[in-house]
Amino acid sequence: MKKILLALLCLCFYGTAAFAAEKSIKEQLRDSYYTAISAASCLGVYLPERSSEFSFMRSHGWEIAPYAFEDEDVRTNFSIASNTCVDCGMELYMVTFKGTTNKKDWGINLKTSHTAYGGTTLEEMEAIAKRDPQEKKPAVHEGFNTYVDSVLRSSVVDAQSKFKGVFKKVYETPNSHLILTGHSLGGAAAT
């Protein structure tokens, strides 16, 4: 009886371990796919209409739209790509921010002083950013904060700090996944 019980326990243990390993490989493949597509998107965002990376992504079902906005401080360039995950049925959205490409961007990079950070609306974030960063509150790179504020104003939230565009879709669609990525200044914005 002990041998049968031991055999059943071993079968359960090894069967569960094999199933867990299979799931782990699937997750690893999915992570590798996300990483490869994110890297391709980081390259493609520099020449969105002509890039071979975006052509490759489009050939695999990705819909990609480039965006550019400019205000007095920042020129914001990014793309929004969307696709449906074949094996999980989840809606995937990827926002890719372009990196440093001009003097204005370098000006943003070189604003290295800290600024206070926090809040849940644009107004709160702007008010907190005007505080002294030495108040023992979270602080971020001033230039990156300026860039992210520009992105938020131009494409993420409306005047009432409600999500709009793709961010609204992600917020309202429970079975969706948002990937934020970028290179250089774009990587800072994505973070």
Where in the sequence are the language-model features?
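Gly/Ala-rich beta-loop-alpha elbow adjacent to hydrolase catalytic centers
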Residues: 182-186, 190
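Sec-dependent N-terminal signal peptides
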Residues: 4-13
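Sec/Tat signal peptide C-region and signal peptidase I cleavage site
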Residues: 16-20
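A short secondary-structure junction signal
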Residues: 107, 190-191
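A conserved cap/lid and substrate-binding interface adjacent to the catalytic center
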Residues: 61-181
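Short intrinsically disordered, low-complexity segments
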Residues: 11, 36, 40-45, 133, ...
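N-terminal low-complexity, Ser/Thr- and acidic-residue-enriched intrinsically disordered segments
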Residues: 21-88
